[in-house]
Regions:
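Catalytic alpha/beta core domains of metabolic enzymes, predominantly
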Residues: 22-25, 39-141, 147-149
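Conserved sugar-transfer catalytic core signal across GT-A, GT-B, and GT-C glycosyltransferases
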Residues: 7, 19, 93
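Single conserved hydrophobic/aromatic residue that forms the stacking wall/gate
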Residues: 1-8, 12-13
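C-terminal alpha-helical cap/extension of soluble enzyme domains
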Residues: 101-102, 109, 113-202
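Alpha-helix-loop-beta-strand connector modules within alpha/beta enzyme cores
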Residues: 18-32
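Alpha-helix N-cap and loop-to-helix initiation/capping positions
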Residues: 14-19, 43
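Glycine-rich phosphate-binding "P-loop"
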Residues: 33-35, 56, 173
């Protein structure tokens, strides 16, 4: 599977479509479109509607952190002639995204609480038990809040995996740097991970 995103805030819709059309026509790989407007050019609903017409475009990961953008993608996917799907790329919107029709999510939270994350996915996708899913999401929320709120989420996740779970995580690739002792305290406090890690066991 190929993931492709576009850099440049001035990229026009036609350029976006041409870019993905080129990838579609020159590769047999399935394509995941990545919408991350904080660091790349945002993809409009109209653009996504056109991209869904490309046979190798199968899925879009939306990290816009805007629920109406993700909802637009989901509804356009449902109307597409071929099977298309949406992945949630923002943990804050996790419950809303699943309830609207997202089929999964790409998550920092799942690295820290994999069992609870899997339980949430099962409740929402397999069992269609949205009340149970909501209760699980409430349990996940302190970690969700930390990963979205803390300014160095990658370092925070690595610290938790090493400090709480005992994994040998090593150091982050530059230019990311480690976190201070004060930041480590904030990570543990905000995530409530020392309590929640006990729920991560079978």
């Amino acid at each position: 599977e190929m993931s492709a995103s576009l850099v440049g805030s001035e990229m026009c819709i036609r350029d976006s479509i041409d870019h993905y059309t080129y990838l579609n026509d020159h590769s047999d790989l399935d394509i995941m479109v990545y919408n991350n407007p904080n660091v790349t050019s945002g993809i409009t609903r109209e653009t996504m509607k056109e991209l869904y017409k490309l046979p190798h475009v199968k899925i879009v990961k939306d990290a816009s952190m805007v629920i109406d953008v993700m909802t637009d993608y989901i509804f356009e996917a449902e109307q597409a002639e071929e099977d298309k799907a949406v992945l949630c790329g923002c943990d804050y919107l996790l419950y809303s995204a699943y309830a609207t029709g997202a089929i999964g999510w790409i998550s920092m939270t799942a690295n820290i609480l994999p069992k609870l994350s899997a339980d949430f996915h099962k409740a929402m996708i397999v069992d269609k038990d949205y009340q149970k899913g909501l209760e699980i999401y409430k349990q996940l929320y302190p970690v969700v809040n930390m990963t979205e709120r803390f300014p160095k989420p990658t370092q925070a996740v690595k610290y938790i995996l090493q400090e709480v779970y005992g994994f040998e995580e090593g150091i982050c690739r530059r230019p990311r740097r480690g976190i201070s002792d004060e930041e480590k305290k904030l990570v543990l406090e905000w995530s409530e991970i020392e309590r929640l890690s006990k729920t991560n066991k079978n």
